């Protein structure tokens, strides 16, 4: 992309925002073309530096690249098992969506009662955005609980 924005996770809870641009786009910008509410203060900058340090030290992105295909595989297994309830599974990395034929809110509510927090996106899509440190066992537990709901 020509411009990429990031916030929220960038400071791991400390309000901060940032954007990166290609050289061509950056060269076309002048001072004052872009303003920021959460950029550049010393606390936020220190938080971002620490987050980057931890990401590198703990190989967070390597872990995400290993675990994301597993999440996709497990969600698609559910789709194959319940084709009358799950219309589609799509997404990239650890940001996945499951489109249902029914109401996503019903499944989200039932999952909360089972101890798993999910969110819906619209009326028929469950959004999956686990923490970047999610493990296979967490995905398995979530999928087992989804299977209980879809199989009921």
Go through each PLM region and give its residues.
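Conserved N-terminal phosphate-binding loop of PLP-dependent enzymes in the Aspartate aminotransferase
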Residues: 1-152
């Amino acid at each position: 992309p020509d411009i990429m924005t990031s916030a929220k996770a960038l400071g791991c809870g400390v309000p901060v925002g940032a954007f990166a641009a290609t050289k061509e786009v950056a060269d076309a910008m002048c001072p004052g073309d872009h303003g920021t509410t959460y950029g550049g203060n010393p606390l936020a900058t220190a938080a971002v530096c620490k987050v980057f340090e931890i990401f590198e030290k703990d190989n967070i992105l390597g872990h995400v690249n290993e675990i994301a295909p597993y999440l996709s595989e497990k969600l698609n297994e559910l789709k194959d098992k319940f084709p009358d309830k799950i219309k589609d599974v799509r997404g990239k990395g650890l940001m996945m969506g499951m489109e249902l034929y029914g109401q996503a809110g019903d499944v989200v509510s039932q999952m909360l009662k089972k101890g798993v927090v999910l969110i819906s996106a619209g009326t028929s899509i469950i959004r999956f955005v686990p923490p970047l440190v999610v493990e296979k066992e967490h995905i398995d537990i979530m999928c087992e609980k989804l299977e209980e709901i879809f199989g009921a």
